[in-house]
Amino acid sequence: ILTHTCRFGDELEYGKKIFHSIKSDNLLSEFVSDNLQLISTTTRENSSFMGRMTQWLLNGKFESATGKDLSIDTDRVMICGSLEMLKEHKEICLQKGMMEGSNSAPGHFVIEKAFVD
């Protein structure tokens, strides 16, 4: 499941481009089949899917939208975004029993800090 949250709808194009390129790639599309989902939300512009993904994970909207909850048995999470969002997502993952990973010790989630502002 690829989630992408931005302030405004036109900022969501990057996530849509990644999603559609995976779905149209001959090798990757066979691997992901119908399992790949895209959940795009906005935080400032009114849209059919509004709110921060951290809120969605905590209030059940993520599970309602995807039919799944995060599982340490089947899921791996890569988190990228603002410093505050990274902290919030990390705490949610830890509460679900997930362990942070690194290059030398794979875990259930990793944090990408290259884009922290």
Residues covered by each model-derived region:
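Reductase modules of NAD(P)H-dependent flavoproteins
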Residues: 3, 10-117
